[in-house]
């Protein structure tokens, strides 16, 4: 992000965040401390916005909601929000677009990690009902949605399965790595000619409680 901003003649401002610390606090039921930490992080962002020209924001859903309660993002100059780092249900995406961003600020859900890179989402259409679909950056990364009990089987379109990642770069090859995520297999959609994944969430989210922390 910083490199891209610099190439385009802009600056990039970072707020340090320790999600593992927050997850530990929540697991230990120290909710008041976790809340204080989130407020501390959001306050730093709110301090930067009035004094710098910032139009693009990269953040997580919970932090975006907290920041939106503190400042008017449009008036602060934000024109596009890239949001990821955790699962986002369709109703959460709808709330962000219609309430937080007031249908005026561009919203771009993202999914990814260090091994895959960034899987971009396609523009939401009315028929999507606010369900985001992501496409891996092929050919360096390929996603497959597999039967978690028989991982050599690919599930059908519209079905839930576990995310399988294959990464191939000049320096690194990692075939068929099972991610800690589950998702719906989605069909190809312009401008992408390969399968996508939708409604990504932690693997086993319906069977057990999973702490995602401030993410």
Model-derived segments and spans:
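Active-site glycine/GP-rich loop and adjacent strand/helix microenvironment
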Residues: 10-215
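Conserved short alpha-helical elements in the N-terminal third of ANL/AMP-binding
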Residues: 2-11
